[in-house]
Amino acid sequence: MSVNIALELARRGKKVVVFDADFGLANVEVMLGIRPQYNLLDLIHNNKSMTEIITQGPEGIGFISGGSGVSELATLDNASIKLLISELVKLDQMYDVVIIDTGAGITDSVMEFVMMSPEVVLVVTPEPTSITDSYSLLKVL
């Protein structure tokens, strides 16, 4: 969903970046068919800036890989999440639209990203588990 929205916004002239915040299970790179040179570990451990780890995709969109299959990203501590948020805020001045694609659930990182966002789009499917999980997230907002 986030990739399709990003591509359509780019076609309409917006400068868009997608931040794949489904840590360790990131799939934006899979959807785009692009293997990024960098992922969030490079920001956290290798002193790369957020802008340095952006990979260019089709239609001019940028994306930041959450690291597909990188188990260390699945268990980020609060300090790492705060670092990501402080770097993410800088992108707001470089892009018209910053899309944060989080994983399902009510983890600390999901809540941090939801609370910092001026607008939230909650994707729900007609499956009972999706409806229940989405309602649970809405209740804690």
Where on the chain are the PLM-derived regions?
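Short, conserved glycine- and acidic-residue-centered signature motifs
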Residues: 2, 77-80, 130, 134
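Conserved catalytic-core segment of NTP-binding enzymes
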Residues: 97, 102-141
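Walker A/P-loop phosphate-binding motif and the immediately C-terminal alpha-helix
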Residues: 1-22
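P-loop/Walker-type NTP enzyme "switch/lid" segment
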Residues: 18-93
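Short, high-confidence coil segments that cap the C-terminus of an alpha-helix
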Residues: 14, 95-96
